[in-house]
Structures are given as C-alpha cells and as structure tokens.
C-alpha cells in the first residue's frame, strides 16, 4: 500500500481553496450576456470554443492533488445542478466560490465551522422558500422563448425554435436535439404516435408516390402473439368488411397463410387492410401495445386476459383518424382513446420514470411518454463548421433544459436579480448563536456574487450597479446586454426558478462540506526510476 500525504486544518483548507479558485475563475468568465469564451484543447481534432460553464468545469483536472480535490468538489456542484435543472452551472460555481472564500476566512478568524455551516443551511432554506414565493408561472410562448434565448447566451433564434417546438408537441412532448446538415436551425415535427415498424408486405402500399399505406379512419386490431392461421382472423375481417372501413393489424408477427390471404384481400379490394409487427421486445412490446390500445380506444387481444382472436368483436378494436405506414415507420394520428384513460396511462408512466434506477429504462419510458403525449419534435442544429456545431448544439441543449425547468417551477427575474431580492427575506433571520449569524451573513454576501460577476464580465462597476439594483423592488434590475435598468421580465430577462434554486442548494451543500473539512489525505507522489539503458551487446560488432 502506497504512503499517504496528509494535511490538516487551515493548510488543508487553503490548498482546497486554491483549487476552488482555479476552477471557478475559469468557469465564471462565461457568465452573462457579455460572458467571454473559453477555448478547450482536445487530444484529437481542433479546439472547442464554449461559453457553457459545465463544459469548462469538466475539462479541468489540476496537477496538485490537494488543489484538485477542491476543484473536483466544485465540479460536482456544476454537474449536480446540470443534472437536475439542465442549466445554472456557472451560477452554482460562482455561488460556491463566494461561500467557500468567506467561510474559510471566518474559520481562520476563529469561528466554529459547524455553526457557520448551520447558518448557511438556515439562510439557504429561507432563501429557497422566498424564491418559490417570488416565482411566476411560465406558460405562454413568449415567456418560453425568452427563457430559451437567455439560456442560449442571448441567441434569439434558439429561443424561438424551442418555443415553436413546445407549442407543436405540448410541454410534456419529447423534443430532441440533433446535428443538422444545413447552416440554419430547423424544426421537424412528427404528429401522433410513431413507432419503428413498417408494413410486412409492399403489396399493402396504396400511395405509390410516397410508397406508404395510408388508412383513413381505420379499425386497429392489437394482438400480442403470432398470427399464422387465417381462420383466427375471419370474424374480424367479416365485421370490418360490413362496416366498409380499413383495418390495421399490429401483432408480434404475421406470416404464412394469414399474411398471403390479407395481401390478396387487400389487392382485390375486398377488405382494405395492412399489417405491421408490434414494436419492441418482451415486456416492453406488451407495454407499447397497451399504450396503442389506450391511444386508439381498443384492447390488446391476449390469452393472458382470456381473449382469443376468434372471439374478437368490433368493441375490441381501436380506431384512429388516420394511420400512415411506411417501409420502416408507422404513425397513428388522432387516436379515438378517451382523454381520461390516456391521462391515466401518462401518469402511470411518469410514476415509473420517478422510481426507475436504470438510465436505459428511463430513456425508453420517456419515449413512450412522448408518443402518448402527442408527438415528437426534432431540432436540427445548423452551423458552418464542426467546432461551431458542437458549441451551438451544447447551447441548444442547455436552452431546452432551461425552458423545461421554467415550465415546471416558473420563472424569476434574471441577471442575478432574484438572488439579490431574496436577501431581503433574510434580514430578520437569526441563528442560535453569533457564529450561526456569521454563516447567515456569508450566505447573504454570496447571493450578490452572480450579479457582480455578470456586471464585471460586461465591463461595468459591480458595486455601483449592485447598490442601484438593491434599492429597487420586485423585477427592477440591470440589463448587462444593453447596460440599462428596468423591469427584467418586461425586458425578457428571465431565469427558471428551478435553475436558481438548484444552483443555490448545491453550492450551499458543497461549501458546507468544504468549510467543515479538517484533514485531507492523498497518495504521496511516487518518483519513478529512470529506465536503465540496454546493456552493450559485445561480440556482435559485425552486424549491420
């Protein structure tokens, strides 16, 4: 076992603080509308240029083991905030640095670290409650676009395209971000439920131009087993023929005589029919079939529930306004399922998402949720170069997460103003002793740090502008982009409440751990001996 290097007390905390400052100073230059770029060197390809705080933080590993521990702990603040809120990483880093600097100073001055931590925790809890009261709902398209614009570093086109996507697929719908092939951002929207299974035979195609089978107001038969015998389907086909409607069959597989008979019936115009395989495998296939059943108002024909194909009646079939079947995809538009049943199914899937621990399962559940919620939107990011593409895609991802957070918990004035307003809620707050009161004061001063940094990055005088903003009320603040004061919400400068809350909570949590650190242990660096030179191979001088 290798020897350990141990540091105690103020020496340990100061080394850790050096690491915190190195990481935070690199990250905080990106904050605000006039934030600066950071260039990241990559082991292959060209360098990456970014204004995303978490991307900068993730690149940093320091040479000194003790300093690196401090840097990694602040990196954790950025990562956790990003995981929960999808944005606010730079704000969280700035808050953590301010809390740690003041906390370490106070411990060096003889304060009790545990009481300082209790004071910071007490102030944070009160501030979070005040933020929630200060929050305003974010439901209209304009507000969503403004949040997206701010998060994408004041790129209006990004805010607009995200608001457009949310309007088309709903706030619960799935929006994905992909690399596009052009110079401009594009939005692709797939209405209804789409799954990745196409027609089982090209003879079902009725639109030769698009090579698709289009069914208007069809019945939908769902079966969780294989269909090989046409006799099983005869009662259903007869009922559908009498109604004069089309039929889509979704089953685990349809082959042999059954598929051949369906093709012949369709080509002769006896019954307009198409067949596709059910998407997914195993239990996931059953779950998706149930989703389609709920969406179309039908039932899954299964031996498990005591239903066989021969006993199927019109009541067991689902319906939809339109179904389009391509070679590889099927889209069900406007299923006839009852809204209360669909909402119940959505709530059930949301509950499963909350409890699952597997990232893969969560991803698949989110896909199902999107399909039931009414569509999928794909934002295709356009750029001139690969370097610009990576940077732009990162910003669009951030903006998308921020808008989701805004819809979830509402918005507060941006530009660091919300945290300055929250300080007033802490004015009457006192701890159990003097040291806890110092902890509360540390938290108050730290809450000024984001606004100070935004102003500093914009080239302004932080103290003067902070005093002016502090004199104001409610949404009154400073727009660093235009260098003007006014109502932040009217100027379109908003922050999602969830982002500000998560940044403050995580910064307070990690800084509390750092302030109460009394010892640090790391491996002693090993001096690796130089490799010995190869021995002289005497007697082999004649070799060339």
From Swiss-Prot:
Region (Disordered): 525-544
Keywords: ATP-binding, Chaperone, Cytoplasm, Isomerase, Nucleotide-binding
EC number annotated for this UniProt entry: 5.6.1.7
Biased composition (Low complexity): 525-537
Source superkingdom: Bacteria
InterPro entries in the cross-refs: Chaperonin_Cpn60_CS, Cpn60/GroEL, Cpn60/GroEL/TCP-1, GroEL-like_apical_dom_sf, GROEL-like_equatorial_sf, TCP-1-like_intermed_sf
Principal localisation: cytoplasm
Record bears the keyword Signal: no
Gene3D superfamilies given in the database record: GroEL, GroEL-like equatorial domain, TCP-1-like chaperonin intermediate domain
Catalytic activity: ATP + H2O + a folded polypeptide = ADP + phosphate + an unfolded polypeptide
Matches recorded under Pfam families: Cpn60_TCP1
GO MF annotation terms: ATP binding; ATP-dependent protein folding chaperone; isomerase activity; unfolded protein binding
Function statement: Together with its co-chaperonin GroES, plays an essential role in assisting protein folding. The GroEL-GroES system forms a nano-cage that allows encapsulation of the non-native substrate proteins and provides a physical environment optimized to promote and accelerate protein folding.
Protein family (similarity comment): Belongs to the chaperonin (HSP60) family.
Protein's name in the database: Chaperonin GroEL
Underlying gene: groEL
